[in-house]
Each structure stands twice: as C-alpha cells, then as structure tokens.
C-alpha cells in the first residue's frame, strides 16, 4: 500500500501544484539504513518527504494519539507509520526504530513539533537511536506550501537533503554528545533553508 499511496499522492500533488524539486538525493546512503530528520509543519511535508525519497520506503514515527481510532490506525500502519508517546518517552520508544534499522529500513523522524520541549525530545531520540544503531542521520528541509490553498496557489515544493551526520557511540558523557549533535542538526537545518 505504501508504494500505491506514494505514487497516488505524487500524482495528486503534481496536478494541484506541479512538479516537486528534490535537491541532493545523491547524498542518500545506498543500500544502507539511516534516519532522516525533517522540518515539519503540516501533513504536506510528510507526504513530500516520502515522495522525495521514493522508491526508498520510510517508516515514520508518529504521535500515538493518531492511532486512537481503529480505521486511522490501520491506514497509518499500512503506510509504515508507528506510534510513539512524545509526552512520556521511555526506553520502549527506541525498540521499534532499532528493530527497523537492524532490518536495513529507513526511519523518519520529524523533530519540529509544536512545542520546543517536544522538538528537543524528538531530536534527542533520533540521536540516541542513530548512536545505538550505528547509522547516520540525514537532515532534510521542506520548503513550500503547508495548506491546500497554498498548494493551489502553485507555490513551489522543494525537499533539500543534507550531508550525513554520524553520531559517535554514547560514552559516559552522553549529554555532551547529544548536545553537540543537536547543534550540528540545527545548523544543518539552517544551512539547508538558506539554499533557497
């Protein structure tokens, strides 16, 4: 279903808004697992990231509240999304993404939440997962419309991918590694945004 949904949504967005531009796709690791972290404001950037990385499927981390209704839960599960408790993250948050990465899958995390505390938790989660799984983090920035109205206004959609960020294995000084990597990710986001 993931492939069908990606191709279908790609067609719909093309008809509404024209072709999307993907920059630096050649920087993606080939045949190796990685974590992609992307800026996030609406459902449109999630869809566009999936389209940009296609045919590589992304397993999206999504807030558990979206899985409360059975129908929505079934759809999200078929679209490779898995739930996470953002308000009370614990060791179990690492289990699913680590299992996916071990199977050489790609995990998508959107750290730009509605609250600064949530953004930090999600960024830290991505860093800890990358360290434990020994996989790189690929920063991505979406620039474009965030509403149906803006899509119809033909505002251009662009996904820009950055250089791989390699997180060292966590030692006793986990906090320093996390903070340093957080700064690198934030700086990468800003640099990618400035490319437009």
Where are these regions (language model features)?
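Structural signal for hydrophobic
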Residues: 22, 75-76, 137, 161
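Catalytic core of membrane glycerolipid acyltransferases/transacylases, capturing the structured
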Residues: 30-88
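Generic preference for hydrophobic
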Residues: 22, 36, 60-61, 81, ...
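Membrane-anchoring hydrophobic helices of lipid-metabolizing enzymes
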Residues: 1-35, 44-45, 73, 80, ...
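Non-catalytic C-terminal accessory region of glycerolipid acyltransferases
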Residues: 92-196
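Residue-level "edge-of-site" marker
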Residues: 26, 89, 143
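Short, basic, glycine/proline-bearing loop/turn elements
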Residues: 9-10, 78-83, 110-114
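A generic structural signal for well-ordered alpha-helical segments
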Residues: 13, 53, 76, 100, ...
